[in-house]
A protein has these predicted regions:
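Sequence context of c-type cytochrome heme-c attachment sites
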Residues: 58, 69, 74-78, 94-95, ...
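Sequence context surrounding c-type heme c attachment/ligation sites in exported
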Residues: 11-18, 22, 109-167
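Bacterial N-terminal signal peptides
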Residues: 1-9
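Short, surface-exposed secondary-structure edge patches
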Residues: 83-86
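Short, well-ordered loop/turn sites that connect or cap secondary structure elements
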Residues: 88-91
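Internal, charge-rich low-complexity segments
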Residues: 102-110
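N-terminal pre-domain segments of enzymes
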Residues: 12-72
Length: 167
């Protein structure tokens, strides 16, 4: 009975809901291990302890749409100074997922229209490209690129090339 309780409690931690944090030089190969952004039942999901944000001045990225999320560690907060940028606590993770609409799963549609919510992001009609993480460590910010292949994205520090037929 005790073994069953141990196994069940171990499984509970691996269910996506709240995200994980990894120290420098200990980053996982798969994005899903962070629990920040993942695919579930053909839908893109984010962690319960993260929130979606948008920029008031969007940046152009070859017509790619972007899902931006921010995760600040529990019981922590960001600070603001009029003369400086925001101060984020160690453990903060900023993510930006680049994707295109792809009605047929092959070619992509160039559009800048998306309402910024997860409600209409059917993965079968998207072409996920990359998720970039900015991770706040004790020594500063570290950038990690994860390239999407199938149902997950994989750490690829050197980047990647993708052919995208356009309709």
């Amino acid at each position: 009975l005790l073994l069953c309780v141990f196994l069940l409690s171990g499984c509970e931690d691996s269910v996506p809901g709240s995200s994980q944090f990894f120290g420098s030089n200990n980053y996982p190969e798969r994005l899903s291990e962070w629990g920040l952004v993942w695919i579930d039942a053909n839908t893109l999901r984010i962690a319960e302890d993260s929130f979606i944000y948008t920029l008031n001045t969007p940046l152009f990225s070859d017509y790619a749409l972007k899902l931006r999320t921010l995760r600040i560690p529990k019981n922590q907060k960001a600070t603001y100074d009029d003369n400086e940028s925001f101060g984020f606590p160690v453990g903060t993770v900023v993510s930006k997922t680049f994707f295109y609409r792809s009605p047929n799963g092959q070619s992509v549609t160039l559009t800048s229209k998306w309402d910024g919510t997860l409600d209409n992001l059917d993965v079968d009609k998207l072409r996920l490209i990359e998720t970039r993480l900015l991770v706040r460590q004790e020594t500063g910010w570290e950038a990690l690129p994860y390239i999407w292949r199938g149902d997950d994205a994989y750490l690829k520090v050197t980047g990647d090339l993708k052919e995208l037929p356009i309709t």
